[in-house]
């Protein structure tokens, strides 16, 4: 469907479930590319599954990590993908080839990775129990961002919409606004509750359009701010949030929050159950609650950049939420007026005449001018939904879709193959060519596949024994404790299946005598064919 024809006056948020995406392995995190055509899903077995969101099919699978993937981010042009795993490794991938460009090893677990919105050479990394780090991919250098206090342990960070500033938040509710190029402090403020008590910052998310951003805090309140007001207040300012969003009834803590594609709605996923709360940003009222399967916990939420579609992850499965599409089979007149019933059209006088003698001279010249107007059919206008408010043109080198080639397996028998006498000569030729290939590979004429460069990032004062939150709590003995004795319910049985077939030994189990016994034994010693020994036995 053309994005220009999407209905923009009705409700622009999903209303019901619209199926699931099964990645075979357990899904942990997901993110859309800039156009919403591809969805990258990080899995528990270290693979990255890229879905074609238009066909709802798997377009590519990248065997990225050995440990679970905990964070993903697309580059601006869609050609690169950066991922982080629970073994403290950050990798950049080429989406088309699936190859790893480079790899970074950190001393502590990684909570979040994010590309610079306008410069894909820079990546923001949020390590656990450390200050945020900005990587420069071209020279493999890193810069540790300044924090408010050296005792800050859990610091979250995010680029703003254009990447000009970096917003950081710590466990004491302090927000710092740093200039991306120089890391200079531009503005700062503290998030407080009703009194002077502070609350920890859990995440910072920016809208794709406009200057608004939200802060998810530990007091279970989502605060929406205007970035322009933050910069105006300067250091140690006291800006007031535009909206405060919360669940007053259940006091629900929030696992993940994000804006809609147009920035008019905010969705928050509950940390207690698979439930999505949707608010309207302008007035702050709750417009919809989407309930998933009871008893499941939510892991991640992502809103489609263009359409009113939400992807959520729970129990390792990606759930899709969309609007209820009502089909309209009505008839329409040529002027797009909807018709309730068939109406016989009454032609006006001289309506379809080539030359209208009754028209006045001014009207005729106006019609001639309209007919002589040239229509441009070669230039392509940029789609406003894909462009930011400060851009005029689309990226011509963007990767919107992945080409898919069918995987053809070699058949056992080729009915269209060469005659038998030609097969022998071809086999001899193949043997000679294979020997040449071995010799050339031994000589080293074929270059091996280039291994990605691995860079160790050293951070001072960071403990090396931290455990990622996805894997559990540090010092948790439940996961390491082995069960003593026999497994529950075995009662001395074999470990294999009780329905294991027994082998035939001698004449045991054959209550036949004489010639019948010998005939059956002879038939059992031969392979069974359709209509052969079985039909004789019957």
Swiss-Prot record:
Residues 344-377, 408-538 are annotated as: Disordered. GO terms for cellular component: histone methyltransferase complex; MLL1 complex; MLL1/2 complex; MLL3/4 complex; nucleolus; nucleoplasm; nucleus; Set1C/COMPASS complex. The modification Phosphoserine is found at residues 350, 388-389, 497, 525. Residues 479-490 have a biased composition (Basic residues). Changing residue 374 to A: Significant reduction in its ability to stimulate KMT2A methyltransferase activity in association with WDR5 and ASH2L. WD repeats lie at residues 22-63, 64-103, 148-188, 196-235, 249-291, 293-331. Ubiquitously expressed. It holds the Pfam family WD40. Residues 330-366 are annotated as: Interaction with ASH2L. There is a cross-link at residue 129 (Glycyl lysine isopeptide (Lys-Gly) (interchain with G-Cter in SUMO2)). In embryonic stem (ES) cells, plays a crucial role in the differentiation potential, particularly along the neural lineage, regulating gene induction and H3 'Lys-4' methylation at key developmental loci, including that mediated by retinoic acid. Does not affect ES cell self-renewal. Component or associated component of some histone methyltransferase complexes which regulates transcription through recruitment of those complexes to gene promoters. As part of the MLL1/MLL complex, involved in mono-, di- and trimethylation at 'Lys-4' of histone H3. PANTHER family: RETINOBLASTOMA-BINDING PROTEIN 5 (PTHR44040:SF1). This is Retinoblastoma-binding protein 5. It comes from Homo sapiens (Human). The gene is RBBP5.
